[in-house]
Amino acid sequence: MRLIALYKTPADPEAFDQAYFQTHLPLMAKVPGLEKTVVSRFVRTVMGDGLYLMTEMFFPDEATLRAAMKTPQMAEAGKNLASFAEGLTTLLWAAELPAA
């Protein structure tokens, strides 16, 4: 199960990156049950609205993700995110599908 965060391009990308990589990601790393985090920067928009970053946070299953969302660590990370990314963030839960 994945928690996916999509970020619109911030007004000040350098300040966003500093807050995100120096503070936010270390806070997220403390969330119980989080197995892996992958951050991708978008380099080209082919169709639709452009985005800045995508972060995929991997959890072993939905129950673990649900539990993680209720932890003090996730609350702290969420409060931190709101301090610099208000209005820029879309959060999604995604389940990996088997290959066809």
Please give the residue ranges for each predicted region:
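Macromolecular interaction modules
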Residues: 1-100
